[in-house]
Amino acid sequence: MLKIGDKQFESRLFTGTGKFANSRLMAEAIQVSGSQLATMALKRVDVNDQQDDILLPLVQAGVNLLPNTSGAKNAKDAVFAAQLAREALGTNWLKLEIHPDPKYLMPDPIETLSAAEQLVREGFIVLPYCHADPVLCKRLEEVGCAAVMPLGAPIGSNKGIVSHDFLEIIIDQANVPVVVDAGIGSPSHAARAMEMGADAVLVNTAIAASNDPVAMAKAFKLAVESGRMAYEAGLACKVSHAVASSPLTSFLDEL
């Protein structure tokens, strides 16, 4: 069981709501994935419409909502968006995203830390999207973030765990859950993150942009479960030389 803030999750696969062909497909894929937490940009939902085609199916399925501040270019924008989200959706959970560069969508570490400090003081449960920077992740933890969400690779790139070495350090030193977010392009990438000891992964593009999002969601569900199981079982140590699994040298010497 994964605990973040005041909630517990059986599923360690978190999902996004963007890039799906339609809301029906989004809802079906998220349901099949088993995900209990889905993020959405406030700008994509009509919070005044109880029948909003993104919000309604998630609420009906009992999926926890994680509004994000996508589109914010600085801390001021992010704090304002967070306050709107809390008022509109009735949740103090927030995925903090600040990426001023629209081409590469790299998170701004300085503005992210500044916004995180203020939002924590205002009572938000903050999950910041950030670079795979061990120092930054530790600082975000120290200011009170409920989890950290370092990137595996740039958003939507599907390149996988390119920040592997830094993620290992972050996971090793963290006292809050580590959710690998962005760049995960295949179920094997998700399994790898879980095998490293990540507490969860967040996947959107790899599911939504696949030829069969529902089947891909199921594949990610199984990958996350198997990766976590492998981590808990304890992976065999890597060695630089061969070690025979069934040595028969003494037997052969007797022939």
From Swiss-Prot:
Location in or out of the cell: Cytoplasm
Reactions it catalyzes: [ThiS sulfur-carrier protein]-C-terminal-Gly-aminoethanethioate + 2-iminoacetate + 1-deoxy-D-xylulose 5-phosphate = [ThiS sulfur-carrier protein]-C-terminal Gly-Gly + 2-[(2R,5Z)-2-carboxy-4-methylthiazol-5(2H)-ylidene]ethyl phosphate + 2 H2O + H(+)
CDD domains: ThiG
Keywords linked to the UniProt accession: Cytoplasm, Schiff base, Thiamine biosynthesis, Transferase
GO biological process, one term: thiamine diphosphate biosynthetic process
UniProt GO MF annotations: thiazole synthase activity
Main function: Catalyzes the rearrangement of 1-deoxy-D-xylulose 5-phosphate (DXP) to produce the thiazole phosphate moiety of thiamine. Sulfur is provided by the thiocarboxylate moiety of the carrier protein ThiS. In vitro, sulfur can be provided by H(2)S.
Subunit architecture: Homotetramer. Forms heterodimers with either ThiH or ThiS.
Name of the protein: Thiazole synthase
Organism: Vibrio campbellii (strain ATCC BAA-1116)
Gene, per the UniProt record: thiG
